[in-house]
Amino acid sequence: MMRQDRRNLLERNILVFSNKLQSEQILEVLIAKQILNADNGDVINSCRTERDKRKEIVKAVQRRGDVAFDAFYDALRDTGHHELAAVLEPLARTIDFITPRDLECPMSPASHRRSRALSPSTFSSPTRVHRDSVSSVSSFTSTYQDVYTRARSTSRSSRPLHASDRHNYVSPSNSFQSQPSSANSSFTGCSSLGYSSSRTRSYSKASAHSQYIFHEEDMNYVDAPTIHRVFDEKTMYRNFSTPRGLCLIINNEHFEQMPTRNGTKADKDNISNLFRCMGYIVHCKDNLTGRAMMLTIRDFAKNETHGDSAILVILSHGEENVIIGVDDVSVNVHEIYDLLNAANAPRLANKPKLVFVQACRGERRDNGFPVLDSVDGVPALIRPRGWDKGDGPLFNFLGCVRPQAQQVWRKKPSQADILIAYATTAQYVSWRNSARGSWFIQAVCEVFSLHAKDMDVVELLTEVNKKVACGFQTSQGANILKQMPELTSRLLKKFYFWPEDRNRSSAV
């Protein structure tokens, strides 16, 4: 069985290997050394992308024991992967040969019974190996390990589920039985996607109104050495500036004729805290008219102090292709995107610009479709009737229709280097909880805080899609209603947030 410190080293550097490993070359060597067999090779080669192949190789090595770790290190050195070999060097030792009986193979239960300690006549003792490897670590690697240890020691606290959490999720056996509601219960969204209970976080109450606010201790950080090892300018956007960039949040809550967007304050507080932790300077604007939204975004785009990236978050009512101001005047979303192009935002030319839109895009409601939950299926979060509201003008059966023939901004083509994350698909409503905020923003904060350290933004938003689609639902009469976010990406490279704790990283 592979030592835990070695498993951890491979796990936390999985992003490095997935970007720089030559899978075909390494796979041949590992098969020749009898670390992997032909069946393993078939599984790896069946992966859809090169990056998935690289990850599968690392996972296969993890499953094959300590001898596989050392053979993997030797293979990296022999094939010219010197940078990757340096990652493993502190815990590695070279070997001259291996035999199948030295491997741990989870596909063959008998191999577990045959596993044994390495013969002293062949290798030095495990204690000696560990001591020698530590003494050979360079000062750079030692500092990196210190930083990582400190980061882990200050990670978020965990707590078990309490009775007050029960209305937030249901088991597969009673997935359509609503539970009593309590505005004072804590949201534990990670349980809905099957995350380990040790990763479950609690959301603090910021006021008597039970706003569940994201805090800095909820963020998983990455350290500077990892960032610079991973970065590839040909395939990744730069995102190293201090601050990372500017973030504008437009939060429309009170409208002239449309209903108040209860719960949007929780969205604003959560998303602003999230991006502050990621290194952005956040500016919030509340209750803007249609014209004021355009002028504010125009000024934001022309700002002279932009960093390596920019973020725009819009929390409002909406319809398909439009955002509605507090004066009930609608603004075409494509006009907003046009303000962010290179001509109107020269400081942001060739830089990633991320737009998050929490608003309805129509009046349709997604009734979902029945699926049979397996034993480890994803439980859904049941919202009591009357708590979840839509962000569309025709919500609640035309009870708050705005006047027609309002001004609509012209549509213009959007440009490259822009990513738009919509809370819902075109023509459908999006849902918002009056205490916890919208489903979409809750999921963004949960997923980004956990995985922004090693996932690019497209991967992150795919996880958000999964969390909203599988982890939330509400009821309207006898109908169970669902929501599906949508991602539109015009990025030309991968974009990583790489949230960096400046206090700990300064020691590197």
From Swiss-Prot:
Cellular-component GO terms for this entry: caspase complex; mitochondrion; nuclear membrane; perikaryon; perinuclear region of cytoplasm; presynapse
Activity regulation, short description: Octameric ced-4 activates zymogen autoprocessing and enhances activity of processed ced-3. Zymogen autoactivation is inhibited by csp-3. csp-3 has no effect on active ced-3. Zymogen autoactivation is inhibited by csp-2. Inhibited by cysteine protease inhibitor iodoacetic acid (CH3COOI). Inhibited by benzyloxycarbonyl-DEVD-fluoro-methyl ketone (zDEVD-fmk). Inhibited by benzyloxycarbonyl-VAD-fluoro-methyl ketone (zVAD-fmk).
Coiled coil: none
Compartments reported by the entry: Nucleus membrane; Perikaryon; Synapse; Mitochondrion
Gene Ontology biological-process entries: actin filament depolymerization; apoptotic process involved in development; defense response to Gram-negative bacterium; embryo development ending in birth or egg hatching; execution phase of apoptosis; muscle cell cellular homeostasis; negative regulation of cellular response to manganese ion; negative regulation of execution phase of apoptosis
Broad class of where this protein is predominantly found: nucleus
PROSITE patterns: CARD, CASPASE_CYS, CASPASE_HIS, CASPASE_P10, CASPASE_P20
UniProt protein name: Cell death protein 3
Region (Disordered) residue spans: 106-130, 148-184
Role noted for this protein: Acts as a cysteine protease in controlling programmed cell death (apoptosis) by proteolytically activating or inactivating a wide range of substrates. Component of the egl-1, ced-9, ced-4 and ced-3 apoptotic signaling cascade required for the initiation of programmed cell death in cells fated to die during embryonic and postembryonic development. During oogenesis, required for germline apoptosis downstream of ced-9 and ced-4 but independently of egl-1.
PTM note: Autocatalytic cleavage removes the propeptide and generates the catalytic subunit p17 and two non-catalytic subunits p15 and p13; autoproteolysis is induced by ced-4 oligomer. Cleaved by caspase csp-1 probably at Asp-146 and Asp-376.
Subunit description: The active form is probably a heterodimer of the p17 subunit with either the p15 or p13 subunit which are all derived from the precursor by autocatalysis. Interacts with octameric ced-4 (two ced-3 zymogens per one ced-4 octamer); the interaction causes the autoproteolytic cleavage and activation of ced-3. Processed ced-3 also interacts with ced-4 octamer to form a stable holoenzyme. Interacts (via large subunit p17) with csp-3; the interaction prevents ced-3 autoactivation and delays ced-4-induced ced-3 processing.
Swiss-Prot/TrEMBL catalytic activity: Strict requirement for an Asp residue at position P1 and has a preferred cleavage sequence of Asp-Glu-Val-Asp-|-
Family in the record: Belongs to the peptidase C14A family.
Domain CARD span(s) in chain numbering: 2-91
